[in-house]
Amino acid sequence: MVPTFLALEVGASALFVVAAWLALRRGRLPFLELVSAATFGLLLEQGNQIIFETYEYSPDFALAIDRAPIVIGLTWALIIAGATRITDALGVRRRYAPVVDSILAISLDLAFDAVAIRMGLWTWRDIGPEQGWFGVPAGNFYAWLFVTWSFSLVTRWLRDPSQRRVAL
């Protein structure tokens, strides 16, 4: 067991537990949003591994579901839920909120991914460390924008019953 990976998994899991506890204190819906973001992240990671095979995770992660480390899904949730909380706190208009959420999430990912590949957390296929954005292909960032935008759009739509009323 590699100490760096263990520290990352324990640390991110602890942050997720704290975030889940704080979300639950705000109500059931914020908690469900956080848990659904983690589930969404795990499913997307697993799907990418099976379908596209654009990258592979290090075998040094202690906890994984098939090819996707659980900590990755938890960090997805922390990033996406954190972005939506910031957008909500800033009072961004509902129609622009998913776009702002995406920009906030991609801002974090621009920094995280370049560091993560150098730490050996995962390896991109068909791209070297000097290519793309410090070794990260542009497609990764497009995916983050789309995934965050779509998750935010659906979550915010489900969150607000007035958006679902059908005029007769």
Q: What is the role of each PLM region?
A:
Residues 1-168:
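Aromatic-rich, lipid-facing transmembrane alpha helices and their immediate juxtamembrane interface loops
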